Amino acid sequence: GCIKGATWFSFDPKSNFDHLYMTASGVGSCRLIDLEQKTVTMLPDLGNKTERPTIINWTVDENQDMIVSRDLSNNGAVNIVLSRASGFKTKTLLEDSQHKQKGVTGAFVHPKTGTLYYTLYETQPMWRYDFATKEFTTFASHMRTKETLRMVVHPTGKYAYLLRLYSSQQNSYIARMDYNEVLDKFSEPYIIAGHASKAGYVDGVGGNARVNGPGQGVFVKNEDYTGAEDEYDFYFTDEYNHCIRILTPTGRVTTFAGRGNGSTEGGYADGALRTEARFFHPWAIAYDEKRKCFYVGERGEKHDGTKQAVIRKIAQEE
């Protein structure tokens, strides 16, 4: 089938890495990619084009219901819960009656507490929703208004990354928020890679590195780090550099795949990760722990997702 506008990937935690959900914000319906049956199914119940379902998370209770965060253009319930028991058809709106909200661009669920954290495009304060108390509160602020931020929490819940996918000022960075278990609170974000006022393509450490449109990322265990305080590398899409990068626990950014044959332009090319492979505006990425491979979702020739695009697989040759 035709794939357009891949925005975000999320594995169903009860599917043993067989069911991969994909959003296509602003372009079309969400999809279920069944990796076991090798089928793709349109899912209009998860939201339509105007509702712009963008991020998918899961509750941490025994039900592990689906949470869809929406980039609404008008005020409304920016987060909804779809029950697993209903086949993800029955919706519960998480709407804050005290504050008008629209335009979620990033969200995650803390793996230990189950609290939902999210950020809005037009305002700086970031929000949290407590499922137990049903309370909405702010907890920190990001750098500027009108920046599209993706959010990814570490598997341990000890910290989370903010990835600036878009800003009208054309700058890109990855920031980090540290979690205080005693206070049940995240710190204010601080930049660990890239620059708040610059964008580009440079492998390096911390502020010396340059990125240009970091989007979704995924933590993957590195066997070389066994026994270390942090055993995970962070793989992330870099849209305008048309590649996949790695951020190590020490803050070093390297290029994992893309920009084959020395090209700085986007394109479609399979082959060796660094010498041949090329991508076109990658936004989504997921790691399949069962099959030991990555899936990369691209926006295609036009980053708005209106052109036909593809989902690529990165795996060791058999």
What kind of feature is each model-predicted range?
Residues 281-318:
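Blade-level signature of beta-propeller repeat domains, shared across WD40, Kelch, NHL, RCC1
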Residues 216-220, 224, 229-248:
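Loop/turn-rich, solvent-exposed surfaces of beta-rich toroidal or solenoidal domains
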Residues 28-31, 76-81, 124-127, 172-175, ...:
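A short loop-to-beta-strand structural motif that recurs across blades of beta-propeller domains
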Residues 1-7, 26, 37-55, 71-74, ...:
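Gly/Pro-rich loop segments of beta-rich domains
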Residues 11-17, 60-63, 109-113, 153-157, ...:
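Residue-level detector of Asp-centered blade-edge/turn motifs that repeat once per structural unit
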Residues 1-35:
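An edge-strand/N-cap motif at the start of beta-rich repeat modules
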Residues 12, 19-27, 59-61, 68-74, ...:
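Conserved beta-strand positions in repeat-built beta-propeller and related beta-rich domains
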